C-alpha cells in the first residue's frame, strides 16, 4: 500500500493486477515460521506445472521455501500453497501421502487501508487502487466466496478508529452490514445510503454486499474500550502480581483510562507491564 516494495503488472490479467514479489516472499517466510511443524507434516497433493522445480515428494514447507530464495516466483508459490491448504482431495497419482488439510485462520489488520488508492503507480502514472494489487484482491475475495475456506476456518478482518484513512465507502459498507444484521432490508428507507452526489467507491460498497437472495456469512462485531471499572480490575491484576507498583485509586485509574484512548486494553496493558526501578545513591 505504501509503495515501498517492488511490484509488477501480471501479464494477461483482466482487469490488470499487480504482484508484489518481495512482500509475498516475506509473507511466505512468516507463514513457515509460524506453522513449520504443520507444513512439514503435509505432502504436496496437487499438480503445479508452473513450478517445475517442485518435486512430487515435497512437503508444504518445501513448497513455501521456494518463494524465499526467488521472489520472482513467490506469487506462484503462494498460489500453489493456497491451493494445497484448501484441497479437499488429492490429484490423480498423488493419493498415497494425502492428509486432510486443517482449518485456517486468516487475519487482516488495518482493513481500511485496503479501501483506497495505493501509493503505487501504473505505467500511465495513475494511482493503482488497492483492490488491483493481487495480494489484496486475493484476501478480499475470500469475503465474497461462501466456500473460500473449504476445510473450515475463520476470516478475522479488523479496522480501527485510529490510524485509519477513513474511507467513506467502507464506513457505509459497514453500516449496511450492521443494518442487515439488525433485520433492516435493502429496500427500507432506514437502510444506509451514500450521501447525494458523494464519490463513494462502488468497489468498496459492493465488497460486503451478499449475492442476491443469499445470506452473507460475514458478521460485524464492534469492540470498544473497557469501562473505568473494568480498567480498574484489569490494572489490579498487574498490581497484585507485583509488576505494577502503584496505588490503584480512582484518580490514577481515570488518568490511565484517558491516556489509553478510552480504555483500549492494549494501551492499558502497557501501563500495567511498565516496571518502575529505583536506584539508591552509593555512599
Regions found by a protein language model. Give the residues of each.
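Short basic/glycine-enriched coil/helix segment immediately N-terminal to the Walker B
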Residues: 90-103
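C-terminal alpha-helical "lid" subdomain
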Residues: 101, 105, 177-182, 206-283
